[in-house]
Amino acid sequence: MGEQQQQVERQPDLPPGFRFHPTDEEIITFYLAPKVVDSRGFCVAAIGEVDLNKCEPWDLPGKAKMNGEKEWYFYCQKDRKYPTGMRTNRATEAGYWKATGKDKEIFRNHHMLIGMKKTLVFYKGRAPKGDKTNWVMHEYRLADASPPPPPSSAEPPRQDDWAVCRIFHKSSGIKKPVPVAPHQVPAAANYQQQQQMAMASAGIIQVPMQMQMPSMSDQLQMLDDFSTTASLSLMAPPSYSTLPAGFPLQINSGAHPQQFVGNPSMYYHQQQQMDMAGGGFVVSEPSSLVVSPQDAADQNNNAADISSMACTMDAAIWKY
């Protein structure tokens, strides 16, 4: 019955939905400063007193006046490691509290310094080989800290001996990697890219191939290797001996193809020159000054036929 009554007295009478989440400035102004001025008379329903050197962090939620919260507030007095020193003893039976980072300054109205906030992390074991845990403490103290008094002094505790501590357990959630959509690459491009990456990893450098043209001396050497007869046969014009007499040359003119019938006498001189060249004789160029009467008549007739056809047809429709 007594424990149940004590539990009821510890719970503050707050309406449903209200939570105790003061700001840093509110903790210094409304909860720490009045406690320093009147440590015995000032009492807050949401903050209890505890000796942090005799309690492990996982036992503190059961000693808090506010249940069901994720952070717990306590008044505590600093335990000086040395009577004339400024260092605080922060060790417990299972481990110790270690300060981390730089103290944060707390201002009123953004210009008046009223307090400081220190962040500490709890380590299991003994320093300096303790195991870090997720228990974190924010220690609030007033900004005006005077030197500690002599041990023989009977003065009451100084204002920097009191502090408000906020304890909470930091969750260590593992962040899931964000899936990245694969980049769509064509098969041929992907294969070529993989080849380039494999060659680059193997230290192989790709150099573009350049075609080397033969020099002039090489070309002359190649010409010297051929005989006179072979060179003459290569330089001879194409043979028209396979063409029958009156071989028609067809000219496509849209939907009306026309045929041009050549005279076999036009190829007489060319055929004669090719036969002589094939026999190994050197043939001189035909003279343009001496023309037989029959050849002149044939050339005139062919020129007249061609000119008449060219006049009636568009040059853009000639196809070879």
UniProtKB/Swiss-Prot annotation:
Residues 14-170 form the NAC domain. Its main location: nucleus. Expressed in developing seeds. Gene3D superfamilies: NAC domain. It holds the Pfam family NAM. Residues 114-176 bind DNA. One of its GO terms (molecular function) is DNA binding. GO terms for biological process: positive regulation of DNA-templated transcription; regulation of DNA-templated transcription; regulation of endosperm development. Keywords: DNA-binding, Endoplasmic reticulum, Nucleus, Transcription, Transcription regulation. InterPro entries: NAC-dom (IPR003441), NAC_dom_sf (IPR036093). One of its GO terms (cellular component) is endoplasmic reticulum. It is found in: Nucleus; Endoplasmic reticulum. It comes from the Eukaryota. Transcription factor that acts redundantly with NAC26 to regulate the expression of genes involved in the biosynthesis of starch and storage proteins in grain. Directly binds to the promoters of starch synthase 1 (SS1), pullulanase (PUL), glutelin A1 (GLUA1), glutelins B4 and B5 (GLUB4 and GLUB5), alpha-globulin and 16 kDa prolamin, and activates their expression. Possesses transactivation activity in yeast. The NAC domain includes a DNA binding domain and a dimerization domain. Forms homodimers. Forms heterodimers with NAC26. This is NAC domain-containing protein 20.
